[in-house]
C-alpha cells in the first residue's frame, strides 16, 4: 500500500537521521532534531502506531538510514506450504523475521524456520526480493525489503508452542488460513507457490 504522506514522513526521518549523524553546526542539529520529531508524529498518525512506539523504533537508529530487511523461508511438502501461527496476532505467515547481524540471508531462513516451526531446512534458491510498500500490507513506519528463499525440508518436527508462534501447518494454496498481512499477503503466498514450482531460475524483483 503506497501512501504518499507516510512515504514523505519516512524520507524526512531519513534526512534528519543523516543530518544528526554528519552535521556539525549546532543550529542545524537542532533543526534536524525538530524534523525528526515531526517525522515521528507523522509516521505515528499515518501508520496508526503510538508515538512512543515509533520513537522507540528509531531511538537506536543512527547514521545513514537504510531499509530494514525481512527474510521469509518458503518450504513445500506435497504441494503444501509451511506456515506458522504468529503469537502476536493469531494469524499465519511464512516462517521468518528481521535479518540478523552476522548471519547471511540463507542462515537467517534456516534459523527462523527452526525457531518458529521446529523444522530443519536447506536453502535452495532465491525466489523474490520485494519492496513492502509496493504490496497490500498495512501502513508501517519502516521501509522494508522482503527476501523470499525457497528451502528444502530435511528434518525436525513441528513446534506447536514456540516463543513467537503457537502453531505450525502445511496448507494448500486453495485452503489458506487467516494470514498475518503485516508479514505476508495472500497474493505473495500465491506468488511463492508459482515461483517455487517453476523450473526457471529467474528471481522476481520490485
Provide a role label for each language-model segment.
Residues 1-32, 91, 158, 163-206:
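Nudix hydrolase/Nudix homology domain
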Residues 99-122, 131-188, 192, 204-206:
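Unchanged
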Residues 27-29, 33-72:
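Acidic, metal-coordinating catalytic segment for phosphate/diphosphate chemistry
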Residues 55-94, 121, 125:
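N-terminal strand-loop-strand
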Residues 9, 16, 36-39, 117:
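Long alpha-helical scaffolds
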Amino acid at each position: 500500500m503506497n501512501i504518499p504522506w507516510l512515504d514523505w514522513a519516512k524520507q524526512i526521518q531519513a534526512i534528519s537521521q543523516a543530518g544528526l549523524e554528519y552535521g556539525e553546526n549546532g543550529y542545524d542539529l537542532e533543526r534536524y532534531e525538530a524534523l525528526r520529531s515531526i517525522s515521528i508524529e507523522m509516521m505515528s498518525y499515518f501508520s496508526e502506531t503510538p508515538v512512543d512506539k515509533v520513537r522507540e523504533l528509531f531511538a537506536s537508529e543512527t547514521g545513514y538510514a537504510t531499509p530494514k530487511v525481512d527474510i521469509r523461508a518458503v518450504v513445500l511438502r506435497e504441494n503444501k506450504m509451511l506456515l506458522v501461527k504468529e503469537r502476536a496476532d493469531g494469524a499465519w505467515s511464512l516462517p521468518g523475521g528481521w535479518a540478523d547481524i552476522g548471519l547471511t540471508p540463507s542462515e537467517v531462513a534456516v534459523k527462523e524456520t527452526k525457531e518458529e516451526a521446529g523444522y530443519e531446512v536447506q536453502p535452495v534458491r532465491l525466489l523474490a526480493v520485494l519492496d513492502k510498500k509496493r504490496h497490500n500490507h498495512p501502513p508501517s513506519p519502516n521501509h522494508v525489503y522482503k527476501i523470499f528463499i525457497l528451502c528444502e525440508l530435511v528434518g525436525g518436527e513441528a513446534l506447536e508452542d514456540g516463543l513467537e508462534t503457537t502453531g505450525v501447518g502445511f496448507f494448500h494454496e486453495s485452503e489458506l488460513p487467516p494470514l498475518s498481512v503485516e508479514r505476508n499477503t495472500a497474493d505473495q503466498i500465491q506468488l511463492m507457490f508459482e515461483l517455487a514450482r517453476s523450473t526457471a531460475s529467474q528471481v522476481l524483483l520490485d
